[in-house]
Amino acid sequence: MKTIITKDGDLEIITQYAKTYMDPPERERVGCRGIIIKDGKVLLSLEERKNVYMSPGGGVENGETLEECVVRELSEEAGLKVKPVKHLLRVDEYCFETLWVNNYFICEIDGECERHLTESEEYNGVKPVWIDIQKAIEIFGDYESKREDQASLYLREYTVLNKCRM
């Protein structure tokens, strides 16, 4: 896997290429992910069925801003009302035929609400978990032992969490 770091104004952009990718990609998916760190722990989403961790988030819907997307996604997946306080960075991830544009926001918790999972999230057993940040970095740092699609995701998350520690 190859990584390139650039900037767009103040926003750092990390471009990662999986072992297998198309350039140009067949499709692009723009999404947002929230980073919440509290008492040395980071909030992650766990897909129990696949035993896969990732930062909570998902795709931007039509007419939605990036900030609105991260607020909605953390509400749906984690049952949290959040306030995005900083657009930390963007990770452009080329994996197979898709370019995944992941916008990461540092968020603060502003309350709780009811979770609303998609059918797919229900099926995969998506749930919010708080994990010690060092343990999360270790989990994601094992990306080379994963199959290619998960390795790409774990490298992305590993890169982002290390940026949060700086």
Give the positions of each predicted feature.
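A short coil-to-beta-strand element that immediately follows conserved catalytic motifs
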Residues: K81-L89
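Active-site-adjacent beta-strand/loop module that shapes the phosphate/pyrophosphate-binding cleft
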Residues: E93-H116, V129
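Conserved hydrophobic "DFG−1" position in protein kinase catalytic cores
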Residues: I36, L44, I106-C107, W130
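Nudix hydrolase/Nudix homology domain
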Residues: E121-M166
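Conserved Nudix-box catalytic region and its N-terminal flanking loop in Nudix hydrolases
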Residues: C32, I37-E76
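Acidic, metal-coordinating catalytic segment for phosphate/diphosphate chemistry
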Residues: M1-R33
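Short loop segments at secondary-structure junctions
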Residues: D39-K41, E108-C113, I133-K135
